[in-house]
Regions:
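Glycine/threonine-rich beta-strand-loop-alpha-helix active-site module
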Residues: 109-113, 117-120, 124-131, 138-189
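Anion-binding (especially nucleotide phosphate/pyrophosphate-binding) glycine-rich loop
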Residues: 74-139
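A glycine- and small-aliphatic-rich helix-loop capping segment at beta-alpha/alpha-beta transitions
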Residues: 23-27, 56-57, 107, 143-156, ...
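Glycine/serine-rich anion-binding loops at beta->alpha junctions
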Residues: 11-17, 127-147, 246-254
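Glycine-rich nucleotide/cofactor/substrate-binding loop typically near the N-terminus or early
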Residues: 24-99, 190-200, 206
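Extreme N-terminal starter segment of soluble prokaryotic enzymes
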Residues: 1-5
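Acidic, glycine-rich loop-and-beta core segments that form the ion-binding/anion-interacting portion
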Residues: 196, 201-241
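Oxyanion-binding "anion nests"
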Residues: 223-287
Length: 291
């Protein structure tokens, strides 16, 4: 054999994609020492996505301190490609459910503010292309916190700011002010790994389907769904965009909807996004074996 491409996903909970690929490569080289072996660590947009993209682009980890779902400071990292143009962000690294103790899980009170802080940091470092994985969140704030970190301001009917973006404040939002939004956002491209098709609200929406997994009881679910309906109407009135029933708008507690409405994001299945980012179709050309 002259060329082998290794593209192995992680073995959940026991072996990362990178290590699995290295092991396979060592075995092949021990039998075919002259063979060209290309390792493409891979992920489906969930666990391991960030590290795979950093490695595939010869990028670097960027350490950052940001706010977790309960607005506590936490150290984490994201990635930037070697050319400095693309940022790789895993929402779960700062807004994820495992960061909230089981007894404090309440999507009425959690926020995506930290995810917005990471996006803002990457903007200030010059990134204009973003690849974001939004699985595993602890939130149902429809990305309100994220948007606040990027400069959006939300107020109620009396013109008073609603406070930190949490699920409980969605019902209060009546006005959106974008005058202080980070100026670089208009020139950015956002691609989001999203493997669900749920609408923004309703029986199949963010609150009813996902909020119970994040600690919500029946009363909370109903309140969150009402908040999402209100926010969707304010978005429609302000931007002219109706995200109510857009497939994927309900992902990550409504985060998908805000990414669509405010950042003009493109939602893609995680594996499709990863294969495109890795230039997979070109890498496997002329391969004798693909693992």
């Amino acid at each position: 054999m002259k060329k082998v491409v290794i593209a192995i996903d992680s073995f959940k909970g026991c072996l990362p994609s990178v290590e699995a690929g290295k092991a396979a490569a060592e075995g092949i080289r021990s039998v075919y020492p002259e063979c060209e072996v290309i390792c493409l660590p891979i992920a489906d947009g969930g666990e391991g996505m960030l590290d795979v993209l950093i490695m595939a682009t010869n990028g670097q980890e960027v350490p950052i301190s940001a706010h977790d779902p309960l607005m506590r400071w936490r150290n984490t990292y994201y990635g930037i490609s070697e050319n400095g143009e693309t940022a790789f962000i895993e929402m779960a690294s700062i807004s994820g459910l495992p960061l909230v103790p089981p007894e404090r899980r309440n999507p009425m009170l959690t926020t995506t503010y930290g995810t917005g802080e990471i996006i803002r940091d990457a903007l200030e470092r010059g990134c204009r292309n973003f690849i974001i994985g939004i699985g595993g969140s602890a939130t149902n704030d429809a990305g309100l916190g994220m948007l606040q970190a990027l400069g959006f301001r939300f107020s109620d009917k009396e013109g008073k700011e609603v406070g930190t973006g949490r699920g409980e404040v969605l019902i209060k939002v009546a006005h959106i002010d974008s005058t202080c939004v980070h100026p670089a956002l208009n020139s950015c491209r956002f691609t989001v790994a999203c493997d669900v098709q749920n609408p923004f609200y309703g029986p199949e929406g963010a609150a009813y389907v996902f909020a119970p997994q994040k600690g919500a009881d029946r009363e909370m679910v109903e309140a969150l769904d009402a908040g999402l309906q209100n926010f969707a109407e304010v978005i429609r009135h302000t931007t002219g965009k109706d995200i109510s029933h857009h497939p994927g708008a309900g992902a990550a507690g409504g985060m998908g909807g805000s990414l669509l409405a405010f950042l003009n994001a493109e939602l893609k299945p995680g594996i499709q996004l990863m294969l495109e980012a890795l230039d997979f179709s070109n890498k496997i050309k002329s391969a004798d074996l693909i693992i």
